[in-house]
Amino acid sequence: MNFLAHLHLAHLADSSLSGNLLADFVRGNPTQAYPTDVVDGIFMHRRIDVLTDNLPEVKEAKEWFRPETRRVAPITLDVMWDHFLSRHWAQLSPEMPLPEFVRYAHSQVAMILPDSPPRFVNLNEYLWSERWLERYREMDFIQRVLNGMASRRPRLDALRDSWQDLDTHYDALESRFWQFYPRMMVQAKNKQL
């Protein structure tokens, strides 16, 4: 899962949106550095990552990547799941339109920015102003996201080429998303994540 799905599942679980978004920027045990609700959100994010990576549907999808891009498949898939969530938001979360959810999420996350790591603050400058969460629905934007990550981290250069795998297996990936994501939504609502 990437930013949008983590925020969405956190919202469904009444968990800290801030902690769930911050988690990738926090190493080790966060309990001394953040309030309890943010810490709980960080741990929820970590559980979701482990759960998602071990889902049969996700394991199967990783195998569809070519040998030269399989190493980055987990990252590419995380971004792609956000694409499908953004694209089908109205169907999956009809009670709150995506732009309204994004405004709400931004207001929640903004509260912790003064005490956040610089890399997280930097991400937030672009995430909200450039409307990433809403633009995930556009495949051109997904390609831009993958290229941007590859540019910032040369060891992840294969992300650029992983675009072809997404394009080739788009329909099958969308089908797998529909198999597991609604299930995760139920787990979130039942506080099982």
Curated annotation (Swiss-Prot):
Q: Which domain of life is it from?
A: Bacteria
Which keywords annotate this record?
Answer: Fatty acid biosynthesis, Fatty acid metabolism, Hydrolase, Lipid biosynthesis, Lipid metabolism
Q: Give the Pfam families listed for this entry.
A: ACP_PD
A single MF term (Gene Ontology) = [acyl-carrier-protein] phosphodiesterase activity
Query: Which EC numbers characterise this protein's activity in its record?
Result: 3.1.4.14
InterPro entries assigned to the protein according to its UniProt record, in alphabetical order:
ACP_PD, ACP_phosphodiesterase_gpbac
- What are its GO biological-process terms? fatty acid biosynthetic process
Q: Which reaction does it catalyse?
A: holo-[ACP] + H2O = apo-[ACP] + (R)-4'-phosphopantetheine + H(+)
Q: Which family does it belong to?
A: Belongs to the AcpH family.
Sum up the protein's function in the record's words: Converts holo-ACP to apo-ACP by hydrolytic cleavage of the phosphopantetheine prosthetic group from ACP.
Q: State what protein this is by name.
A: Acyl carrier protein phosphodiesterase
Q: Which organism is it from?
A: Enterobacter sp. (strain 638)
